[in-house]
Amino acid sequence: MAQILLAEDDKATRDLVKRALESDGHTVTVTQDGSEALEQVKEGGLKFDLLVSDVEMPMVDGVALAERAFPLQPGIRVLLMSGFAEQLDRAKELSGPHVAVISKPFTLDQVRESVRKLLA
């Protein structure tokens, strides 16, 4: 299964998404904000298949994180999540076959389906 980097500042959301992805057989590395996630990407110890990130986070937001992750880990896929319309619009600017955007609140089935499509 996939190596997934999860960047989410809300603990409840982070824990739910992590458990769902792990129950599907993925290995999940968890970070609490964009700068912590960026450090994981930069370290290069793990090659991540997928970045799952909130858009609105302290320090480095999810869109900036994705933009920085692409050259550091070529081939990485990105799932961006947000509850704010203007942030969703910004996230959709990264659109392509390697990026998906879902709005909060979401169901775990929506997360799983988005992950499945991105990794296919």
Label the model's feature ranges.
Residues A64, R77, F84-S103, L108-R116:
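Alpha4 helix (beta4-alpha4-beta5 surface) of REC/receiver domains from two-component response regulators
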Residues D33-E36, V60-L65:
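Acidic catalytic/metal-coordinating carboxylates
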Residues E8:
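Conserved acidic carboxylate
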Residues D54, S82:
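Active-site residues of response regulator receiver
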Residues V30-L50, F70:
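Acidic, metal-coordinating helix/loop segments flanking the phosphotransfer/catalytic sites
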Residues M57:
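Receiver (REC) domain active-site loop signature in two-component systems and cognate sites
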